[in-house]
Amino acid sequence: MVKNKDHPFRKKWGQNFLADGNLLDKIARTIDPKTSDNILEIGPGEGALTERILPFVQEMVAVEIDPMLIKTLEEIPSLKSLNIIHGDILMQEIKDLPINDPVRVVGNIPYNITSPILFWLIEQLDYWEDAFIMIQ
C-alpha cells in the first residue's frame, strides 16, 4: 500500500486513519467479506481497510470527500477495480450509487458525523443488509 505521509489531516473532516495492520486484519475478519458481497465503504481514507476487503468481494464502491485522498487511492495498484466516488456520503443515496443492493456498509467515521451517518443509514434501510461502523 502507498502511504501518503505528507497528507495533511483535515480538521474540518475529522480525519484520522487506521494504520495498525493487526487491527485492520481483525476488522476485515469481523466483516468477513464474501465473493457475493457488494461493499459500500464510507471514507476509505488511504485505503488500508479497502485493500483487505476488495480482493474478496464482487464489487466495492468507496465514497470519499477529500480530493487529495482520491488521488492517493487511484494510484494504488491493488485498488484498480475499486469504484471511487468523490463526494459527501450524506449527500448520496445508496440506490443511486453504481453498486447493486443490498450492500454491506463499512466505514471508519469521524466522531463528529456519527449521528448524521447513523440517521442516513436508517433512512436507507431497504438498500443495505449490515453495517460495520468504527467511530474515531
Where are these regions (language model features)?
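Catalytic cores of RNA-modifying enzymes
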Residues: M1-I135
